[in-house]
Design a protein with these regions (language model features):
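Short, glycine-rich, amphipathic interfacial segments at transmembrane boundaries or analogous
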Residues: 10-49, 110-131
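C-terminal terminal-structure detector
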Residues: 94-163
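A generic fold-level signal
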Residues: 4-7, 45-48, 71, 107, ...
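Gly/Ser/Thr-rich helix-start
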Residues: 6-7, 17-20, 55, 75, ...
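A short, structured surface patch at a secondary-structure boundary
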Residues: 43-106, 148-156
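Intrinsically disordered, low-complexity segments enriched in polar/charged residues with Gly/Pro
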Residues: 1-2, 17, 89-91, 101-102, ...
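A hydrophobic, helix-centered structural microdomain
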Residues: 1-33, 70, 142-163
Length: 163
């Protein structure tokens, strides 16, 4: 936005609990033309579509702050599987067994998979992350959520695991 013009916020449709679509808003970290033709593209670790400011706010996770609105609206929780875009969900439902089970709980700002698996941008990565998401679905509760939140604070404050 400061470097590349365009809006400060980026809003996308995401898939939440029970497959319900909702709008997720983030601070925009990529160029305005990052997805030419409207085709969804997974972001990669060192994505060249990111702006300089975008790389900084992604590394510090500040780009995620506006998602608190989705938590207040009830579309998301603080902890749960990260919500994906409908295009990716459709593909992953076809290619990854049990992928839809992750939608039996609200998506979260942070999750077990984000703490346990490095940043990924492929079907194979989605399969690996799903193992952690399914573990969360089966075992979620107050104590587990608090543990995930505390570990997330460590990641944000000390940069461990930040992309």
């Amino acid at each position: 936005w400061m470097e590349s013009g365009g809006p400060v916020f980026d809003s996308q449709t995401r898939v939440g609990e029970r497959g319900r679509h909702f709008t997720l808003t983030k601070f925009r970290s990529m160029r305005v033309d990052a997805e030419k033709g409207g085709v969804a593209v997974w972001a990669s670790k060192d994505d060249d579509r990111s702006t300089r400011v975008g790389r900084l706010i992604r590394k510090t996770r500040l780009d995620e702050l506006p998602q608190l609105i989705a938590v207040l609206r009830g579309d998301m929780s603080f902890v749960g599987p990260r919500p994906e875009r409908p295009q990716f969900v459709d593909m992953l439902n076809d290619e990854v067994r049990y992928y839809g089970v992750r939608h039996s709980v609200k998506p979260g700002l942070t999750g077990w998979a984000q703490l346990r698996y490095p940043y990924g941008a492929s079907v194979r990565d989605a399969e690996e992350k799903l193992k952690f998401d399914l573990f969360y679905v089966k075992n979620h509760g107050l104590v587990f959520d608090l543990m995930i939140l505390l570990q997330t604070v460590e990641v944000v404050l000390f940069g461990r695991g930040a992309r």
